Amino acid sequence: MRPSRALIDLDALRHNIRLLNSIAHNARCAAVIKADAYGHGAVEIARALKGEAPKLAVACYDEAVSLREAGVTTPLLVLEGFYSSEELADSTRWCDIEWVVHDMEQLDMLSEVAPLRKAGPDSTRMQTWIKLNTGMNRLGLPLNKLAHVAEKLQQFPGLSVIGLMTHFACADELDSLLQQRQWRAFQAGMQAAGANGWSYSSANSAALLQYPETHLDWVRPGIAMYGASPMADKTGADFGLKPVMTFESRLIATRELQAGDSIGYGAAWTADAPTRMGVVAVGYGDGYPRQMQNGAPVAVCGKRTKIIGRVSMDMLTVDISHIPEARIGSEVELWGGTVSADEVAGYASTISYTLFTGMTSRVPRVYINRSEVV
C-alpha cells in the first residue's frame, strides 16, 4: 500500500475552535467547511464540530446537500447563495439552510419559490442573509440597495431575513486603509438596517484574530480552524493553533551521491559535495506542488531537512546526509507539527489554503479522534 496519507487530528480541530470561540468572546462561530473542509473532509469535520460550532458555512448548495445526505443536521450557511430558482425549490426539502442574497437578480428567483413556503416556525421558513459589498467588489449589494432589498424580502410570508454580512479583502494586514474603509461601510450598513433583530457578521479568520471590533454576532473562521495562519508573517502556532492535517509519506530508496551528480528531471539540483539522499513516495500527483523550490523544509525521522531536486508526479528527493538512521520505510512529514504548512507554502509562492485544498483523492485521509485512529 502506498505510504502517502493525510492524518486529520480531530482533537486539534476541537482545540482550535475552542480557542477561536474564546477569542471571539460573545460572538458565535459559523465554522467554514467549504471545499471539503479545506481538503480535510467536510462530513467528518462537520461531525467533529457538533456541539462546538452552532452553524457551519459552505460555498454552494451542492456542498450543503452532501452534508444533509450524510446526516449532518447543524444549520448551514450557503456563502455563494443560490444560482437558480431550481436550487431554491429543491432546498425546501431540508431544514435550516441559510441563503446569502448578494445580487438583485436573486430577487426574481426568490419570487418564484419563496411564496411556496408558508409562514411557520423559523426552521421551516426560507432563511436569508443580505450580503453588503463594502469594498471587496466580489459579491454583495451596494448600500443604496439595502433598504429596497430588505423590504422586498420581507414581503414573502415564507421567508425570514436573519442577518447582514460582508467580507473583508485585507483583514490579514494590520492598519490596512481598505480594511478601515470596509469596516466603516459595514457600520453604515448596520445603522441603515436599524433595530430589526438581525444578526451581523463580518469577521473571517484574519479579522477574528486581528480586529476584535469586527466580531459582532457571528464570526466565520476558516483557515485558522485548521491550524494555519491567514497572515503571511505568522504561523498558526503563533496564535496557539494546532495543525489539524499532517501530510506524511515514507522513504522508498536511499542513494549516495558524489560531487557533481544531479537529481531528477532537468537536473535541477547538483551536489557540490558527497550527499546522502532519500526518495519519498509523494509528488504533484498527490497534491504536493511541483513548483516547490529547492530547500523547502520537510522532516525525516522527526528531523528537519530539505528537498533537493524537482518534484515529480509520484516522488520527490530529500537530503538525509545528517540523518544516519534514515532508511527505506522511514517516516517523512511534508507538513504538520514539525514543519508548518504556512512555512512550506512560502517555498511554493502560495498559501496554506492551496496546499490543503490541492491534495488529491489519491491521498487517503486518516482520522484521529480522542488520540485514536478511527
Swiss-Prot record:
To which species is this protein native?
Answer: Hahella chejuensis (strain KCTC 2396)
Positions carrying N6-(pyridoxal phosphate)lysine are K34
Catalytic activity field: L-alanine = D-alanine
Name by which UniProt lists this protein: Alanine racemase
Q: Which pathway does it take part in? A: Amino-acid biosynthesis; D-alanine biosynthesis; D-alanine from L-alanine: step 1/1
Q: Name one GO molecular function term.
A: alanine racemase activity
Q: Which SMART domains match?
A: Ala_racemase_C
Question: What does the entry list as the binding residues for substrate?
Answer: R138, M313
Q: Kindly list the organism's lineage.
A: Bacteria, Pseudomonadati, Pseudomonadota, Gammaproteobacteria, Oceanospirillales
Give, as one word, the top-level EC class: isomerase
